[in-house]
Amino acid sequence: MTRLLLIISISILVIGCTSCGNKADEQEMKVSVIQTESQSSPKIILLVIDSLMNEPLKKAIQEKKAPALAFFLKHGQYSKNLVSSYPTMSVTIDSSLITGAYPDQSKIPGLVWFDNNEKQINTYGNGMFEIMKLGVSGFADNIMHQYNNVDLSPNVRSIHEDLYNMKKDSASINAFIYRGNYHHTLKVPKLITKVSNLPEEYETLGPKILSLGAFIRQNTKNNHIVNRIGLNDAFAVQELKYLLEKNILPEFTILYISENDFTVHRKGPDTTKGIEKLDKHLQEVLNIFPKWEDALNNNIWVIIGDSNQSSVNERKKEALIDLQENLSKYRILKLGKPVSKDDEIVITANERMAYIYKINESVSVKNIAGKLQTDPRIAWIAWKEKEMIHVISGDHKGSFIFKPGGTYKDIYNQAWTIKGNTSILDLSLKDKNIHYEDYPDGLARLYGAMQSQEGEFIVVDAKPGFEFIGESSPEHSGGGAHGSMHKEDSLVPIIVTGTNKSIDQLRIVDLKKWILDFWN
């Protein structure tokens, strides 16, 4: 089991050395340039760059360290205010992006959460030590099968499913959410199956073209599968180049570029190192065209970040909000242990936000909230009572209560019933109109998290500079972290080239409809 942990946890979760490719193959790639031809309809390439942020992006461009991104920016439209999903964790964001729905509909609550029906903690990869305690096999099964085929609600449709119904083809490269209508077989590397109880194959449903590291690839000569089992940027870019060179790029392609996230977590939000590295990969893609400008012919490029990151205080004792310590009077479910009759609460920390679950009738959700309200590092605490969401804060008197429907409207034309102290979520009101300040689209995003799962639970959100930890949570003191609803974690850049078609609402949850409208 130790060997398996090293293979999966380190290979998948930790960036290793640069992938080893075949030089002859790389030379062949350079020679095989694309011949541009006119097409009847444009093709859309969506590049999702994990933790791409406005300030380091602009800095890298100004210092001429990101010529590919500078090229796209020069030839496109730009905004730094695309609103992410909530929690601002990749799996939830990916779910909103690909389904056009918040977690109340997609049912993907976060990177780690407690399944009230199964009475177990689910993780999609929140740090090596947490995975070790919860079980590597269960984690692998979640990623390989459960996530797309079970957990993602059947009541929402992915962009791949909608495109299939429109008789359009699509591709997914290294994106963990990819559900579609085509049957695929994911093959687990033999090195892993030999030392584990994982099956050799997983059956899954995806788009017509699916690439996911060493588990499934289109280019059999793509040798970038050593580093993180192919779940790396070099692998992803080689797959995109292959589709372009073979002229098999479908109407829609989503490509996930992940490694910048690891760099920002370690070095902090100001670093440009990750951007400089990923830009070299984008240069590889542009270089296969006779001229970079040819890449824009009949191709619409959409480049987005998924979440921002905010700096975490260097001093661990101050930076890390230890929820086990704060709630030490309660009996807390241990990671990897079955629920016992004496257990009272479950803690699942998602970096700068956390879910705290009541699993014993003797516990009061309000009492837990009241206890957490005394910690000055926590921005606010929320829970639900019937159809109403209640929010309190240590910085403000009283409470704020809201639910969907009512006489108040926000800039997204969403109607709400609200009462109480609006300062808690930094809302301002004018003539029945709601304006968001520190928490963009705060009501819909918080409602989405509160309705994402069953049971009684609390949502806690940290102030900038602080991060929650549970039993074995990863921590990023001195670096960067995300997860919260605050604008520092929530506003990301977007670059769009090749079209003047406006996006009605600058939210990740709205991009699916905007893309599908190209073929309506």
Question: Which residues fall in each region the model found?
Answer:
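Sec-dependent N-terminal signal peptides of Gram-positive bacterial secreted proteins and lipoproteins
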Residues: T2-K23
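Short, solvent-exposed turn/loop segments enriched in Gly/Ser/Thr/Pro and often Arg
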Residues: S79-I98, I173-H183
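Metal-dependent active-site segment of extracytoplasmic phospho-/sulfohydrolases and closely related
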Residues: L278-D322, L327, I515
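Active-site metal-binding loops of divalent metal-dependent hydrolases
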Residues: D50-S51, G305-N308, P464
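His/Asp/Glu-rich, glycine-adjacent segments
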Residues: A101-Y102, S106-H265, G420, L427, ...
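Active-site-proximal N-terminal segment of extracellular/periplasmic enzymes that hydrolyze or transfer
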Residues: N22-Y78, S84, T88
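Active-site neighborhoods of enzymes that stabilize oxyanions during catalysis
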Residues: L152-V156, D342-S502, I508, K512
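Phosphate/oxyanion-binding active-site loops and adjacent basic polyanion-contact surfaces
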Residues: D151-L152, R228-V237, K267, T271-H281, ...
